[in-house]
Amino acid sequence: MKKDDLSKKLTPLQYEVTQNNATEPPFNNEYWDNKSEGIYVDIISGKPLFTSLDKFDSGCGWPSFTKPIVKENIKANTDFSYNMKRIEIRSKDSDSHLGHVFDDGPKDKGGLRYCINSASLKFIPKEALEEEGYGEYLKLFNKKEE
């Protein structure tokens, strides 16, 4: 999708985050404290990125996950902005900036913390997965209930 089209589809914050690598404010974003079951998809491509089953409260003020739902849907780049060396996470298909990954996540879940901007995500509640075309991911939640 062209940048002109994206600026019409996205809110100004979503555009700044996904296209210009901005960071939204901590504790003042849509999903940092979302506790509902479902999946988080790329706001642009709709590709599945994360699941609520892997979301945890890291205390940082942004949605944090221990792993992606489909590893092939994201890519990692070294980021040297703000005089730091970090690993930036981008959506593979839309090349949107999502956030960063750090090695301070829960050790029993692999030790990673994917710190993601809410503005780069769309949440699909568990109840709407089938209707929204993500029915194949219902099995993740059904396993939990067994």
Swiss-Prot record:
GO function terms (MF aspect): peptide-methionine (R)-S-oxide reductase activity
Gene: msrB
Residue intervals of the MsrB domain: 3-126
Swiss-Prot/TrEMBL catalytic activity: L-methionyl-[protein] + [thioredoxin]-disulfide + H2O = L-methionyl-(R)-S-oxide-[protein] + [thioredoxin]-dithiol
UniProt keyword terms in alphabetical order: Oxidoreductase
Protein's recorded name: Peptide methionine sulfoxide reductase MsrB
Signal peptide: none
Stored InterPro entries: Met_Sox_Rdtase_MsrB, Met_Sox_Rdtase_MsrB_dom, Mss4-like_sf
Xref: PANTHER family: METHIONINE SULFOXIDE REDUCTASE, PEPTIDE METHIONINE SULFOXIDE REDUCTASE MSRA_MSRB
Pfam families: SelR
GO cellular component, one term: cytoplasm
EC id: 1.8.4.12
GO biological process: protein repair; response to oxidative stress
Organism: Clostridium acetobutylicum (strain ATCC 824 / DSM 792 / JCM 1419 / IAM 19013 / LMG 5710 / NBRC 13948 / NRRL B-527 / VKM B-1787 / 2291 / W)
Gene3D superfamilies, alphabetized: Peptide methionine sulfoxide reductase (2.170.150.20)
SUPFAM superfamilies: Mss4-like
Domain of life, source organism: Bacteria
Active site: residue positions: 115
EC top class, as a word: oxidoreductase
Family: Belongs to the MsrB Met sulfoxide reductase family.
